[in-house]
Amino acid sequence: MQQLIRRSESIERAAWSNLYRRAPWRVRRRLGLRVLDRGEATFLSASRVDHLLLNRAIGVGSDGVAAAVGHFEQRGIGRFWIHMGSELRYSELPGLLRERGITPYPRSWMKFVRPAAPLDEVKCALRIRPARRNDGAQVGEILARGFDLPTEAGPLLAAGIGLDQWDYFVAEDEREVVAAAAIYTRGDDAYLPFAATVPKARQKGCQRALMAARLGRAQQLGCRQAFTETGMPVAGEPSSSYRNMLRVGFDELHVRDNFAPEGCRWHNLPSSDAIAKSAASPRPSGTWLKGVVLSGS
């Protein structure tokens, strides 16, 4: 079990680092992308996008708290996650984070694993095919909207199209791309980082079909297991993604707790000028010991 947990963390770090580093230069500059590896930890930051998903620290231990918080603080980023595996709940790490004003986020994540084997009984009226480079704009827009990111972040999420280790698949409705999903592979492991469907194409089997396509590709490449994650169920909030993972054969692997500056919440950044607004917004300065409270939904 612990080996699988380590593998799931490792391939997630590798996939997102790969995407940040290999995105086109203009995208890296536009979003303020940076990746910093510190021992077993990886810091992913997008200084011009005020969104939790693109500003995260993975694999931080007790000796890495100062470096992780300092990375985001020095880059002027006030909204970020520091991920912590549930096995560290009773270590000194939570206390060290709280001392810096980094507190538990309301929703933890569940990491999932399943064999890299095809799905049975996949029915979808839409056409499923591998994504092409000229699909990039549509794929990026769908994925960005699916994760409440500004449209300018779309090129980052679609940056893996055509790159080695990455495979993207799309669902078409009369030649219009209406859903997209990606898979990153490395040796025995596959990682499914994101997928999304436009509202009008939901309830048509797109995501199950895209899952089948990705798992089939993982098996074709010789992968043994596939990893992914989604938010834990929270009372009063939708949890369809969690249920869908179980329906397609994923097993719960481990809970990952998320820590963020006090008051941070997920929020929607759909507007085309969101990045300009983010870049112009004042940022908190000084240490987090003062208990900075950030606005958000």
Regions found by a protein language model. Give the residues of each.
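N-terminal charged segments
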Residues: 1-73
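Acyl-donor-binding surface of acyltransferase catalytic domains
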Residues: 21-22, 60-127, 132-134, 228, ...
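A short helix-loop-beta-strand connector motif used in the catalytic cores of GNAT acetyltransferases and
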Residues: 27-34, 76-78, 105-108, 160-170, ...
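Conserved beta-hairpin
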Residues: 34-39, 89-103, 166-179
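A conserved beta-turn-beta hairpin within the catalytic core of GNAT-like acetyltransferases
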Residues: 45, 49-56, 105, 185-193, ...
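Conserved acetyl-CoA-binding loop-helix of GNAT-fold acetyltransferases
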Residues: 64-69, 194-197, 203-220, 243
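A conserved beta-strand-loop-helix scaffold within acyl/acetyltransferase catalytic domains
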Residues: 149-199
